Every structure is written in structure tokens, then in C-alpha cells.
Amino acid sequence: MVKKEGVKKCALDDSELLIELQDTEWPFTYTDHDRQIARAIVYDETGFFYFVRAQREDDFGKVVTIETSGGGVEPGEDLRSAVRRELKEELGAETEVVCKIGLVSDYYNLVHRHNWNHYYLCRVKSFGDRNLTRDEREAFHLSTLRLSFDGAVREYERCRVSALGRLIAARELPILRKAMEIIENGGERNAD
């Protein structure tokens, strides 16, 4: 294992990342649940990336964040189906799963949760209507961000002003960089 910038990384195979992170923003008391999450770095043929912007005021504070589209895996649902469903709901995107990027294990101590974030690289085929939940519309005020790679990195850095933004950036910037590496190297790997 190689340690870089406080992040432990090792290859699951020759191409997938495994990143293990601790919550350094809130004190640990206990963890009472694990959450399986399917997430994606989404890009189009012109080189733009798509993310969600959340503007929220809750236990995590009054914050604005950038985050990959994704969410909880439903009972009986496989990871690839979950990521496609989440991308359709949150971005209105029909996508092709190019490959699995990796797995990030992280914690939200404030809500006593351990997250298993399964990241995929997905290419946009088309956009249609989004199907946001009530909370996504009214509590998180989700909107879509279309950014260049450099613009996305700047936005993650800008959102580090909040504790939640720092946790998200620590989890997602290494994944975004790996996704860009895959795209630059042809992007064609087995998605399974």
C-alpha cells in the first residue's frame, strides 16, 4: 500500500482503486450502519463532466457542495443498475457504463454512518427529464453542473470551505483524477 496525501490506496486489480478514509471533521462516537452507494464520474463526447450541486442546511451545516451523482443501492439491485438509475434520476442521463473506477470506504461520523462508495466511469448517451425525490428538490436543492476537468477540480477545492465539502473532496478528487487518466488512455475497459 502506498500512502499519499493522507489517503491509503491499493489496486483491487491492475486498474481499480481502493481508498480508505476516516472522517477528520467530526469526532467518532460510534457507527450504527453501513451504506452501499453507487456513484459515477459522468462525461460526454466533448470532454465535459457532469456533477450535482447541493445547497443544503441540515446537521452538516449550511453548505454548498459539488458531488458525483449517485445514491444508495436498493435491495436486490446490482451496482451497475443502481448507478444507471441514479444518473437517470439526478441528471436525467442515459449512460453507458465504461468501467469500474474503484471503491472508497469513508465515514460520516456526524450521522454514525460508514459508506461503501462504488465508483463507475459512465459516458452520456442522451439527456432527458430528471426525477428528483422531494428531499433532493426541497432540502438539497440539487442542480446539475457541467464542467471541464480543471473546472471540476477548482470547484471541489472551492467547496473545501465547509467540513462536508472537505470530506467529499477527499473522497472524490482521487476518483476524478483516475477517471481522467482512464479517458486519456482510451477509456475502454471491462465494466464488470
Language model: regions and residue ranges:
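Acidic, metal-coordinating catalytic segment for phosphate/diphosphate chemistry
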Residues: 2-39, 45
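A generic structural micro-feature
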Residues: 32-33, 62-65, 112-116, 136-141
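Short, charged/polar surface micro-motifs in flexible loops or helix N-caps
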Residues: 43-48, 57-58, 74, 121-129
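Conserved Nudix-box catalytic region and its N-terminal flanking loop in Nudix hydrolases
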Residues: 48-89
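A short coil-to-beta-strand element that immediately follows conserved catalytic motifs
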Residues: 94-103
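Active-site-adjacent beta-strand/loop module that shapes the phosphate/pyrophosphate-binding cleft
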Residues: 106-131, 145
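Nudix hydrolase/Nudix homology domain
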Residues: 129, 135-192
